[in-house]
Amino acid sequence: SVSKAPVMFVMGNHDKPYDAETYNGCICIEDQIRTFRGIRILGLGGSMRYHPDAANQYTEKEMRRRIGRLRWKLKRNKGFDILVSHAPAAGIHDLEDLPHRGFACFCELIETYQPKLFVHGHVHANYGTGFQRVDQVGETMVVNAYDHYILEFPEG
């Protein structure tokens, strides 16, 4: 990476578990809150479960449980500034089919903590729907980072 910032990521629905060497210096923030330059970043990878035995796929109930296990981290960090997920939130950039449906519990996270930014992927521009890249939900800018999306933050 040519960036001076760390490269952080979450797992997608087709990703397999890797060993630390495979990350090649990148940081998996799955189920963590990482702080960089005072910015608190929460990571929740995976998608809605559409295949019974697949890794990184979750029912709504399973994703809620993951978030519930983070409650002490959320409290200790006084919330978060950026949510990074693979899947979208329900009703925001998602599709009606089960594999591309968003999580309602992400909407609740946004409503409760009002992060400045929610970055997700999973819904590709070439799916033929009315692809929406950026939305605003209350105080939260929602970005579908499919393929790539460049966000610049001021120094400091």
Residue ranges and their predicted role:
Residues 1-36, 111-112, 139, 143-148:
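Core catalytic region of metal-dependent phosphoesterases/phosphodiesterases
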Residues 10-20, 49-53, 89-93, 116-135, ...:
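Active-site environment of divalent metal-dependent phosphoester hydrolases
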Residues 12, 41, 83, 118, ...:
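Divalent metal-coordination and catalytic microenvironments
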Residues 13-105:
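Conserved catalytic scaffold of divalent metal-dependent phosphoesterases
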Residues 34-38, 58, 107-113, 117, ...:
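Binuclear metal-dependent phosphoesterase catalytic core
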